[in-house]
Swiss-Prot record:
Female salivary gland (at protein level). This is Short form salivary protein D7R1. Keywords: Blood coagulation cascade inhibiting toxin, Hemostasis impairing toxin, Secreted, Signal, Toxin. The keyword Signal applies. One of its GO terms (cellular component) is extracellular region. InterPro entries: PBP/GOBP, PBP_GOBP_sf. Belongs to the PBP/GOBP family. Interacts with host coagulation factor XII (F12) (inactive and activated) (via amino acids 1-77). Interacts with host high molecular weight kininogen (KNG1) (via amino acids 402-532). GO terms for biological process: suppression of blood coagulation in another organism. SMART domains: PhBP. It is found in: Secreted.
Length: 166
């Protein structure tokens, strides 16, 4: 009986750690693979780097922001409202559909990066970056959950990036 209770408690604690680890971008950055540590500044500036380590890191970040589903595919509904709040344009729905559409054929570990990369190459890229930055700041507790994109987002991101990109 004790073993069963202990096993259930251990599994529950493990799941809580996994869920909590995916709440903030900062937590993903603390666990970034060694190969990417010297490139973190570039990554934060939305430069696309290729490789399994980058895919793993972006998967963590996109999950932390809630921009992908548990299977790594893009979450249309999590992004359409923030994108349109920044710049109301029908292109966002089209780009989210396009970027999310063909990713199901990829292995789960590659989906989030493929979606991220596609969005950064789309006509919604600027709005995507702004929504990404805003959500990062909200999740980090630096802005309220009801915050809208404003110049304050740029200021706060510049401060964070300034500490990382020395």
């Amino acid at each position: 009986m004790f073993r069963k209770v202990f096993s259930v408690a251990l599994v529950t604690c493990g799941l809580l750690v996994i869920v909590q680890a995916a709440k903030k971008v900062e937590q993903c950055e603390k666990r970034i693979p060694d190969s990417l540590k010297p490139k973190l500044c570039q990554i934060r500036q939305y430069q696309l780097l290729e490789g399994a380590d980058m895919e793993k890191h972006i998967d963590c970040v996109m999950r932390a922001l809630g921009f992908v589903h548990p299977d790594g595919s893009g979450n249309y509904h999590a992004l359409i409202e923030p994108l349109n709040a920044i710049d109301k344009d029908r292109k966002h729905g089209f780009n989210l559909e396009t970027c999310g559409g063909n990713r199901d054929k990829l292995p789960k570990r590659k989906r989030a990066y493929a979606f991220y990369k596609c969005m950064l190459k789309s006509t919604s890229a600027d709005s995507f970056k702004k929504a990404f930055d805003l959500k990062e700041l909200v999740n980090a507790g630096k802005l309220s959950a009801t915050a809208k994109y404003s110049p304050q987002v740029d200021t706060l991101m510049a401060q964070i990036d300034g500490m990382i990109c020395k």
